[in-house]
């Protein structure tokens, strides 16, 4: 299977998992399959439709709209507010959750048939380093709870601090949109910087669905 796309990557793509019966049996009938081959017919249960799936912070709070007048909405990283590349947000700024919730409401109105909507952190690890965010990381941190990992993964997540900030951000969004869309589900990535479970969060909103990905974990130890 030859891959042809806009960005360089391996020349061959493993395709066995795009068989409809296999996809249905392994419960992989979600957005990744939808993007690739549009498989999984109604005979096999159809696709799970996820609106705005992926690393979508730039869609939740568009830098083209807000960066010039409100650089404080974006991550303070290495003493600079960054809006380029794989964007981070200042998740503790109260305006950011409100803007993201408004974006989410717009998506829900525009795509009423979606099974889930999404909050997707970036791959970059560009967590905001402002004073308020750092204080929140400390609040949610589990200093002694890092599991067995390999390589650079041992430095992830400020021991659960970022996961706590991200979940609180997602809770705020879910609470705000529930007024208009009480039954809509919102997916959220938990991986890399948000992989370690935080302390001091006892409950997440009933409409939040956790996408847990143990990337970088050794297979020799339990989750």
PLM region descriptions:
Residues 1-168, 178, 187-190, 209-213:
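Feature activates predominantly on carbohydrate-active enzymes
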Residues 111-112, 181, 201-205:
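Extracellular/periplasmic catalytic domains that process cell-envelope and extracellular macromolecules
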Residues 221-223:
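Short conserved micro-motifs at the rims of enzyme active sites and ligand-binding pockets
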